[in-house]
C-alpha cells in the first residue's frame, strides 16, 4: 500500500500569546482540544482555524464565520474520538485538513541511511508555537519544529487578513541540504451527493494515474483506475475494467468503494508569473474552495480520491475525502522514488526541490473559500488583478473576492500600494 493521506471543542487551557522561551523540544500548551487533538487556534472576524500540535494539521477551518451559514470545507478523519490499536503510521493519528509534508509520500524505502516516517516528521511530530499576534489587519501565528532524520528546522507561519476568507501559509526550511519532495496535503470533506463536487485547475501538461498498486485487495483495498496511464483531461481517465467508459474525475464523488491516486502536472509559470490554481466547486453547498501556488515551486497536484475504498484499520470502509495536494513529488512514493530517476523527472519535470544549508527555502501557499450562486457550477478560469481574484464560469458568471495573491512572490499577506 502507498500511504497517501492524502465541531465539538473542549477547552483545556487558555494560553497567553507570549513567546515560548524554553527548549525547542518543549511542547507548549494548546488552546483547545478539538476532535481529540490539542490544537492552537487563530482567528479573526471572518475565519477561525485550528492547528494540531501533533503534525501541524490545519482543521477545522471555519470561513464566513461572521454569517448565518459558515463553511467548514476540510476533512476530519472519522476515528478521531475513538480508542483502538496503535495507528499503522503516526500521521494518521491527527489526520485532518491541510498539513505540510517533507518528504512528501509514504517513504517506505530509505535513501542510504536516511529514513523518514510517512510524509515526514513535519506531519507527525510536535510543533512549538512561538508567537500569536495581531498587527493592523493581519492575525498571525508562528510555530517551529526541528527534524532529526535530516537535520534542520522548519517554521510554519499562518496569516489571516481582515475581510478575507483566505488562509496564507509560509513554511521556511533551514539547515537542510539536498533534494526532497515536499508540499501541502489539503484534504477536503466530500459531499454525499454523487457528482456534486466539480474540479478544475489551471492549464496542465498532462495527468497520470499512479503506475503501481495504490489500493491493494490483499489488504482490503480497491482502486478503480487503470495504473500508469497518461491523459490530458480530468474528464477522461481510463478505468481498470475493460470495455468501460473513462472516469470523469472532474465530477466527484463517484465509484463508491474505491480509493485512487492520480497526479496532474502544471504548465510552467508564464511571463506574468500568474499563480497556478486548483478549485473544487461544491454545487450542493454553494461555494468554491481554491488553492493558489507558484508552479515553479509546487509543480503538480496529487489527487487522493478516497470513497470508502479501504477496509483495514483504521479506515474500515468509512473514510470519504478528497486530497488536493499541491506538491513537487513523484506521486506519494516518498524521498527515494522522487530523487532517483523516475517516469516523470526523466521527462524534464522536477519531482523534488533542491535545498541548501546556505539559503533558507520558503514554501508559500494560499487557500480559501468563495461563496457562489447556484448557477455557478464550475470554474473555467481565474482572473487576477491587484488584491483580488475573479472566478469565471463557462457561462461567463463572475464572482470576485479579495485575495492578496502577490503573497506567493513577496511573502507579505497585505497588499502593498
Predicted feature residues:
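Bacterial N-terminal signal peptides
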Residues: 2-12
Amino acid at each position: 500500500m502507498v500511504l497517501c493521506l492524502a465541531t465539538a471543542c473542549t477547552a483545556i487551557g487558555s494560553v497567553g500569546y507570549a513567546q515560548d522561551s524554553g527548549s525547542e523540544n518543549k511542547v507548549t500548551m494548546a488552546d483547545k482540544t478539538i476532535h481529540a487533538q490539542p490544537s492552537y487556534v487563530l482567528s479573526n472576524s471572518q475565519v477561525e482555524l485550528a492547528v494540531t500540535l501533533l503534525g501541524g494539521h490545519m482543521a477545522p477551518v471555519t470561513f464566513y464565520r461572521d454569517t448565518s451559514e459558515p463553511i467548514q470545507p476540510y476533512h476530519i478523519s472519522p476515528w478521531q474520538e475513538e480508542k483502538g490499536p496503535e495507528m499503522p503510521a503516526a500521521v494518521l493519528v491527527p489526520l485532518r485538513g491541510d498539513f505540510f509534508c517533507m518528504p512528501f509520500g509514504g517513504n517506505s524505502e530509505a535513501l542510504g541511511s536516511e529514513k523518514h516516517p510517512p510524509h515526514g516528521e513535519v506531519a507527525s511530530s510536535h510543533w512549538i508555537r512561538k508567537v500569536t499576534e495581531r498587527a493592523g489587519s493581519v492575525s498571525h501565528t508562528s510555530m517551529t519544529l526541528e527534524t532529526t532524520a535530516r537535520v534542520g528546522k522548519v517554521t510554519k507561519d499562518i496569516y489571516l487578513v481582515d475581510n478575507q476568507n483566505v488562509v496564507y501559509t509560509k513554511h521556511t526550511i533551514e539547515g537542510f541540504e539536498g533534494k526532497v519532495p515536499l508540499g501541502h496535503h489539503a484534504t477536503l470533506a466530500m459531499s454525499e451527493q454523487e457528482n456534486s463536487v466539480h474540479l478544475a485547475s489551471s492549464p496542465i501538461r498532462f495527468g497520470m494515474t499512479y503506475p503501481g498498486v495504490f489500493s491493494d485487495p490483499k489488504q482490503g483495498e480497491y482502486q478503480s483506475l487503470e495504473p500508469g496511464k497518461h491523459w490530458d483531461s480530468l474528464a477522461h481517465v481510463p478505468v481498470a475494467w475493460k470495455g468501460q467508459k473513462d472516469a470523469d474525475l472532474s465530477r466527484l464523488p463517484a465509484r463508491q468503494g474505491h480509493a485512487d491516486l492520480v497526479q496532474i502536472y502544471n504548465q510552467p509559470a508564464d511571463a506574468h508569473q500568474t499563480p497556478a490554481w486548483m478549485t473544487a466547486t461544491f454545487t450542493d453547498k454553494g461555494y468554491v474552495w481554491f488553492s493558489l501556488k507558484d508552479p515553479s515551486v509546487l509543480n503538480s497536484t496529487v489527487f487522493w480520491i478516497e470513497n470508502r475504498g479501504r477496509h483495514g484499520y483504521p479506515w474500515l470502509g468509512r473514510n470519504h475525502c478528497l486530497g488536493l495536494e499541491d506538491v513537487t513529488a513523484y506521486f506519494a512514493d516518498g524521498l527515494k522514488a522522487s530523487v532517483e530517476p523516475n517516469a516523470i523527472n526523466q521527462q524534464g519535470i522536477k519531482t523534488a526541490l533542491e535545498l541548501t544549508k546556505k539559503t533558507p527555502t520558503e514554501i508559500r501557499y494560499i487557500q480559501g473559500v468563495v461563496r457562489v450562486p447556484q448557477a455557478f457550477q464550475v470554474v473555467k478560469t481565474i482572473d487576477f488583478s491587484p488584491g483580488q481574484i475573479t472566478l469565471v464560469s463557462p457561462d461567463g458568471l463572475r464572482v470576485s473576492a479579495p485575495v492578496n495573491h502577490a503573497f506567493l512572490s513577496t511573502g507579505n499577506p497585505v497588499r502593498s500600494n
